[in-house]
Design a protein with these regions (language model features):
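A short, small-residue-rich loop immediately preceding and capping a beta-strand
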Residues: 463-469, 487, 857
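C-terminal domain-closing interface element
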Residues: 353-355, 511-560, 566
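Thr-Gly-centered strand-to-loop micro-motif
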Residues: 447-448, 467-468, 858-859, 882
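Residues forming the flavin
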Residues: 483-485
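Nucleotide/phosphate-binding sheet-loop regions of phosphoryl- and nucleotidyl-transfer enzymes
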Residues: 2-408, 442-445, 452-454, 463, ...
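Protease-associated
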Residues: 377-461, 524-525, 529-530, 545-550, ...
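Short beta->alpha connector loops at strand-helix junctions that form conserved
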Residues: 62, 468-470, 489-492, 581, ...
């Protein structure tokens, strides 16, 4: 849009009116908005308004609200936006006594994104907007610092070219590095005015060559184009990936903050920095941050220069440091949360550019919450809401096993995000994504000079990140802490050659596929493949925190566990029962699979029973171990579920082996073994085994299987009871679709129970229930509840059968569905509340209408997903069951659901 077109749009809009206020001003000690308006102003805009109203030294400006972004995305932008924006600009110019990009004292502004929820580095920023060929000369004269002026202009052209005009950033960097090389300069700040002028001229030629247009000289053109580019950045790939990872709604949109520039690159008495009121990695109550002198904000977080610790500022500029401490301390008490802040020092004067609630690791989140309760800033109930349920996984991140190992520490960087990662290295985000998708490397470490927001997809699939540049507030550090991944940043002894895909350190060269071990807690980079151990969930802070969490929740939290070792781990993580023991997993052990295969290959009941008789003591021993590990807690045992062919070799493998033997050794006795096996495999082959002969259908066709499993369960329970234990047995029949199927299998279980109790002279209380994993079972739950004493929703299969989507094949189209907004999230990760969830809700109500005491839970992967757990609470389930390592997450999510219900009342909606 040209300057004339901009003015025309203003004129055309002056005759219209709308109730929507698009632009909110802040400055002069007052703001149109306030800190509670995050939905409208975004987090950054609301924070700027709040700081301004609090009288803090905030450069003035204005915020264009999120509705404008949503209109932009819909392609229906109100002309009133420009009217209000230019009115706010005039107000800003009057307050500053400057004009945007004109006059002897030109006003320059920054244009930044700012969504409701923090998305660090995911969207775009333009600094020094308003500079042009005339304004740069005025700025050079006014500041008496030509180097500063020309450096600011070349930064604008590069940022504007990259963000607004889509000129590849690497082409600007190529020009910049070339001039540095020719002039013999190592550091950016050593470039002199003439060299910077040369860079500016080359940058402008590049813009013209790439776009066919000159770099815009009209300040209003720059402003409108920059604003629209920030709106567009809401939809860039990295922002969409981040929102998907953090479950931020795509239609929230971003606000745009236009703010008068203050300059940290004006000279050696100027600087810029970022910080936290507490350590975001550990939660320690210590002032934490980094800064650079003679730099702009992007220099600190980009990783291009390694910044200084903020403690150095106390020595260099004690008055500024003390003022910063006082302001940020005041803001922490005001917001009652750890603050993430940005500041600039211009000619010795401090300006606050932003404050917001800081991103932190799970370890830090728990410690900060506990400390703030002790300090009287928040209550225990508020503390429960201060930690995201998935953050508790940080307490379970792996640790390196070092005892008895010969360790070669290659370098020590900054401990940017705790935990450990051991994997094979790759050097680009694209390679990481490909290696993960293809299975080339099972565990990946992404090695970069520094990461940028474009690397987000690679960071997502990597287990750990290593950078040679950057600090504790660099992009890599901030993003990995939020993701709960290990990161070592600023490992200065490492040279990363991304072009040749090599890492050079201490005279050694590591190439793609080589193994490294990272310790994100200490910052060490270690050669080779160390072993790892999970962290112990007995951290004192975690124990304290969970002691606040558990009394609040109503929902029981069970674990999915198949063997005694898993059950013991589940107890350590707070499991109140086993919600799913998959008995078929016991058959895959090396000493059992041959008996299982013999049972399958048997062509009569007598031979099947003979094979099952050999499996009986093995299953009984496993169940005894489970009952002992869980003591008096409930143990839900599912009878055999998968189709029989899963216990046999693959048909394709058998065909290849038989064909090879026929060609090479046709008289081999092994052929006599393999041919009957192949015949049975082919006999059991199904076109759609997920809906074939499995679950209760196996028990109906081969009742001796159900009989053997029931006998093993009850004999184990009796043995444990005789030894002084108190087993609580719940037997669950899978894939039930009708009351008739349930009656058939329940009768077998109850008959075997009576036989065992009569033989042993001991009775054990037990229940028989079923899995609800077919839509028909949900629809007829009132009938099934006549026989079933409990329901457990197998939400994995219920999702498959409701959507008609195979969980194994969904990745072929899930990315496209997410991109087009058909799915907002993976339905196998988060329960589909509108569809599958309604079946769960309906079946629960119908079942309890028949049997008011019906116990109901879920045992799919959704049992460890926070949103799914909260849904289960709202519809009145008794428990959720998940993998042991998701128990902490489920416990916290259940407590948060109870508190949300306390605040809003019981849910009366469909969700």
């Amino acid at each position: 849009m040209t300057q004339g077109a901009v003015e025309s749009s203003v004129a055309s809009a002056t005759s219209t009116s709308t109730p929507t206020q698009y632009v909110y001003f802040f400055g002069g000690g007052a703001a149109d908005g306030n800190g509670k308006m995050k939905d409208v102003l975004g987090g950054k805009g609301a924070g700027l308004a709040e700081m301004t109203n609090a009288g803090l030294p905030v450069p003035p400006g204005f915020t264009i609200q999120t509705e404008a972004c949503r209109e932009y995305m819909r392609g229906a932008v109100s002309p009133e936006i420009n009217v209000e924006m230019f009115a706010a600009l005039e107000r800003l110019e009057a307050l500053q006594g400057q004009k945007l990009g004109t006059g002897e004292n030109p006003l320059l502004v920054s244009v930044r994104s700012g969504a409701k929820f923090s998305m660090p580095g995911m969207m775009d920023t333009i600094l020094n907007l308003g500079l042009n060929d005339q304004a740069v000369e005025a700025l050079a004269k006014l500041s008496n610092n030509p180097r500063f002026a020309y450096d600011s202009y070349r930064r604008l052209i590069q940022m504007f070219g990259d963000v607004v005009l889509d000129v590849p950033k690497k082409k600007f960097e190529h020009i910049f590095d070339g001039v540095k090389h020719r002039t013999g300069v190592k550091f950016d700040y050593e470039l002199q005015p003439d060299a910077l002028k040369e860079i500016i001229a080359e940058y402008k030629k590049l813009v013209l060559a790439e776009t066919g247009k000159d770099f815009p000289q009209a300040p209003l053109d720059q402003l409108v184009q920059a604003r629209d580019a920030v709106f567009r950045s809401w939809q860039n790939d990295r922002a969409k990936t981040y929102r998907r990872m953090t479950r931020i709604d795509d239609w929230l949109g971003t606000a745009v903050n236009v703010q008068a520039m203050v300059f940290g690159n004006l000279g050696e008495n100027s600087g810029t920095g970022v910080g936290f009121t507490r350590n975001p990695a550990t939660g320690e109550h210590a002032f934490f941050g980094e800064y650079l002198m003679n730099a702009q904000g992007e220099d600190v977080v980009s990783g291009v220069r390694t910044p200084l610790s903020i403690s150095e500022l106390e020595r260099a500029m004690p008055a500024v440091y003390e003022q910063l401490r006082q302001i940020t301390g005041k803001m922490e008490k005001h917001y009652r949360d750890m603050q993430d802040f940005e500041f600039t020092i211009q000619d010795g004067k401090l300006y606050m550019l932003q404050t917001r609630n800081g991103k932190r690791t799970g370890l830090a989140a728990v410690r900060v919450a506990i400390d703030m309760v002790k300090e009287g800033l928040i209550t225990q109930e508020e503390a429960i809401h201060r930690v995201e349920p998935n953050q508790l996984y940080d307490f379970l991140v792996p640790r390196l096993v070092e005892k008895g190992e010969k360790i070669e520490v290659l370098a020590t960087g900054l401990p940017a995000s705790p935990g450990a990662a051991v994997g094979q290295i790759v050097f680009t985000a694209e390679d990481a994504v490909k290696a993960h998708a293809n299975g080339t490397y099972k565990v990946i470490i992404l090695v970069r000079g520094e990461t940028t927001p474009e690397d987000i997809a690679g960071m997502e699939v990597a287990s750990g990140i290593l950078t040679s540049r950057g600090g504790m507030t660099s992009h890599a550090a901030v993003v990995t802490r939020g993701m709960g991944k290990c990161c070592v940043a600023g490992a200065g002894d490492c040279t990363v050659d991304e072009a040749n895909k090599e890492l050079r350190v201490k005279g050694r060269t590591f190439r793609e596929g080589d193994w490294l071990s990272l310790d994100g807690t200490t910052g060490r980079v270690i050669a080779g493949q160390l072993k790892t151990l999970p962290a112990q969930p007995d951290d004192p802070d975690l124990v304290t925190y969970m002691s606040w969490v558990d009394p609040v929740r109503r929902l029981g939290i069970y674990a999915n566990a198949d063997i005694p070792r898993d059950a013991k781990n589940a107890r350590l993580f707070g499991a109140e029962g086993i919600g799913l023991c998959r008995t078929e997993h016991m058959f895959f052990a090396e000493d059992r699979i041959e008996h299982m295969q013999a049972m399958i290959l048997a062509d009569n009941e007598a031979d099947r029973r003979a094979a099952l008789l050999k499996l009986l003591p093995m299953q009984r021993a496993d169940f005894e171990g489970l009952f002992k590990a869980m003591e008096s807690l409930p143990v839900v045992i599912r009878t055999i579920d998968p189709p029989l062919h899963e216990f046999l070799p693959k048909r394709e493998d058998l065909l290849v082996e038989i064909s090879h033997l026929v060609d090479t050794d046709p008289s081999s006795p092994k052929l006599k073994e393999l041919r009957p096996l192949l015949a049975r495999v082919q006999e059991l082959h199904e076109s759609n085994p997920m809906l074939g002969l499995r679950g209760c259908r196996l028990g109906i066709l081969y009742p001796e299987i159900t009989e053997m499993q029931a006998r093993a369960i009850f004999e184990a329970a009796v043995n444990v009871k005789n030894a002084g234990g108190d087993p609580h047995v719940e037997i669950m029949i899978p894939l039930i679709g009708s009351i008739e199927e349930m009656r058939n299998q329940s009768a077998i279980v109850r008959r075997v129970a009576a036989d065992v109790f009569k033989e042993k002279g001991v009775t054990v209380h037990f229940m028989v229930g079923c899995m609800i994993e077919l839509p028909r079972a949900a629809l007829t739950a009132d009938q099934i509840a006549e026989e079933a004493e409990f329901f457990s929703f197998g939400t994995n299969d219920l999702t498959q059968t409701t959507f008609g989507i195979s969980r194994d094949d969904i990745n072929q189209f899930l990315p496209a569905y997410m991109k087009h907004g058909i799915f907002k999230q993976d339905p196998f990760a988060t329960l589909d509340q509108a569809g599958v969830g309604q079946l769960v809700k309906m079946a629960t109500a119908k079942g309890r209408n028949t049997r008011p005491t019906l116990k109901v839970g879920i045992c799919g992967e959704h049992g460890g997903d926070p949103e799914s757990v909260k849904f289960c609470h709202r519809i009145g389930l008794n428990y959720v069951s998940c993998s042991p390592f998701r128990l902490l997450t489920a416990r916290l999510a259940a407590a948060q659901a109870a508190l949300e219900e306390k605040q809003t009342g019981p849910a009366h909606t469909t969700s």
